[in-house]
Amino acid sequence: MNVTELVVFIIYFVFMVGIGIYFFAKSKGDNEKDYFLGGRQMGPWVSALSAGASDMSAWVLMGLPASVYALGMGQIWIAVGLAIGYALSWIFEAPRLRKFSIAAGDSITIPQYLTNRFLSKSKFLQIICAVIFLVAYAIYAASSIKACGTLFSTVIGIDATVAMYIAAFIIIAYTFLGGFNAVCWTDFFQGLLMLAALLIAPIFALALVKNGGAVAGAAPVVEGYWDAFTSWSDIISGLGWGLGYFGMPHIIIRFMSIRSNKDLRKSSVIGISWTFIILIFSVASGLIGRMFLGEISDSSVVFITMVRTIFPAVVSGILLSAILAAAMSTCDSQLLASASAFASDVYKPVFRKNASDKEMLWAGRIVVFIIAVIALLIAANPNSGTIMGLVENAWGVFGAAFGPVILLSLFWRRFTFGGAVAGIVVGALVDVLWLVFLKGTGVYEIIPGFFAGLLAAVIATTAGKAPSKEVEALYDTAVAMKD
């Protein structure tokens, strides 16, 4: 056990919980909108880095470098697809989603927005969305908790399962207490730390390699390791990752929280720039790690091993806290999205129509705890798969189910409630069926799921009744909204 690194981790944890306590102390009188959406008062820097940090979970420091380290340049297409998708979501989706969510009854969750967008009195769509949220987010959050366990077991030497319990407790604490404000502000600081770690570590490692300081020299590599064009299925699947951004609730909800369209434009520049840099240096960490470290037994710890080899304990502790930052910043956002979906889209409309704001806040907090426990149990299961695999599965479901429907709701005036239901159900179903039965094709399930959902939404809309004049008027109002 390295005591210095442990002390750095403890200080980091205390800082994160302190933010949660601060916003809990300020929350007297807060309502549902404040807890789940920050009162739509997020500034450009906090919004941008919070969206980025909640997106780039521990896989960007462990999963992606590990894939690149083990399999080579063909894995860069994941980064390319994500960069393109992220930029497009900020440029085209963010401005409209912010305005449409306000026009649609000042909606504070994605399921609520979709229901209000069509002025529907039915809660069927909200309930379907909430169920998908709870299941998929439990899997997604498990990847973050698993990453924390891997980090602690590698660096400090404690049991991975014990480490997962500790990480889950910290994440629950500040999310439970502080809500959206705490999540966004912790994500802001964690985004800065992730950026610093990914800039510093590979640059120092490359400098040592060039100066003859490599630990083991370049390790034997698989055939075509340095060729990015060896497999068309890798290229298509990698680019397909970008489709996920259009339907990723815990990311696009940041678009709804921004103060104004002016701030949103600033946020887009900051957010896109941050993400591009993060992805470039994540890939670089895998490639440079191959040259610097040679062959290591567990590719998932390539970034950890590189940092600990180069830097003294105090510096490595700070840089490795970036993995905690990545894991926690994503997990907290997923827990909050699950909580808001249940409290606003199931608990109030189905069970307690007259629930007070205080009751809604506590319903959400209880769900934060329950989903975190489920995610912890998944992560602690040795058969749950890799960090990257868990992320891939959850990412695919969200992108396929919600991406086409969100886009159509923002850009197609004639789009209907029935089309939205069909798109979500078919998209999610095709994604899961492809994962179970056709994964051997090498094509990422989000691609057939996304386009099947898109086709189903279009067919159901054109085959059904046109939307009412009131629904069309809502669309026109949102489009015309200045700020």
Predicted stretch roles:
Residues 1-483:
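Membrane-embedded helix-loop-helix hairpins and adjacent transmembrane boundary segments
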